[in-house]
Amino acid sequence: MAQSAEMLWIDALELDQAGDIQEALELARHIVEIDSRHSDAWMMIARLSLPPLNRGKQVMPTLAQAATSLSALRRVVQHDHDNKEAWILGGALLVDHLGMMEESLVWWEQRRDVEPREVMPLIEQIGVLIRLGIYKDAGERLEEMFSDEMEPPDNKELMGMDKVRSLVENAAKMEKDDVFRPANHKHKRWAVIDRMKTRKPVSPTLFLFTFVAPIVFLLGTVAMTLVGGSLFGFVLVFFIILGLFMVVSKFATSLLHKLNRHALDLDRALDVEMSTGKVCIPDDIRGSKLYNAMLGQRPPAFAERLEKIAEVGERLSYRWKPDLPNWMVMADADYEDEIDESEEDGPLELDGIED
């Protein structure tokens, strides 16, 4: 007599707890064949399709593993809208591993249909909008996130809210008059990237030790000389140095972003290629030291999918605009206005770029 899905599910849980991952995975797949609405079994498939921990560290999934897990997660949220873990894992796979930026915006908008007062979807959407350079709408979502209508965030969400607020402010300042649109091969930022393609981005750690630390050390030495002759003075100098470090670090972060502007621009181009499945990066930049350095910071699945996109080589139209949810209709208009303005500029000659 055939066992029911629930009886098999108990067996699958026991196998999972015993560490027999492959057997548990096969049984979970059998369960969803019997009951396609078994969200717990779909969640087990999604989780066990990803690599297990190795010595306490998470192993990055391959492209096939990430895609399989995401497919199962779509079934989880379809049948269990309240499974927050599935929404979070799916969002991470879409952005970090598969590079599907536009899909991730839709994913989190669907989560908002379930929990409209939750701040987490807005945090994730703002992060993606910043990466695509859509600052106006990122700012609008930021205002909504801090409105009284949203539910009180937990500590982790508070940190995320503060982070995206800083990202919006810094990015808007850096690209105030010149938002980089990778699809436009005539954009002047491509010429800058081409000139800087043989240079790796400045490491934050290196910048900390070569710029921030010496300044704080010198100022701290001066403060110690002036007021450090007593216990009270020593304590005062400690807090002075701590304050100086925070102030100088904040200033240095903005400076570091300006120094690495070419790398951040190329990073956006990588995101656009991954999101569209089409190429916009010139051949003479692809494979350069800068390109390899930026790609090396991405997970293996991201690099694997990008390589496949580059092999196909379908060119991204310069009139491309993001395919975004309905709440982003105004963003489409903004993109069209910027494209029209760029067409009025004279052609930019840059070796390696073809129409």
Q: Where do the PLM segments sit?
A:
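Alpha-helical segment of the N-proximal tetratricopeptide repeat
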Residues: 2-34, 44, 50-61
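Charged, low-complexity cytosol-facing tails and large interhelical loops of integral membrane proteins
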Residues: 4-11, 35, 269-355
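Structural signature of tandem alpha-helical TPR/SEL1-like repeats
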Residues: 18-26, 53-72, 98-110, 133-141
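Short coil turns that delineate tetratricopeptide repeat
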Residues: 36, 81-82, 116, 150-153
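TPR alpha-solenoid repeat register
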Residues: 41, 86, 121, 154-155
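Canonical tetratricopeptide repeat
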Residues: 44, 89-90, 124
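TPR/TPR-like (Sel1-like) alpha-helical repeat modules
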Residues: 62-71, 111-114, 127-154, 166, ...
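Transmembrane alpha-helical hairpins and terminal membrane-anchor modules
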Residues: 198-272
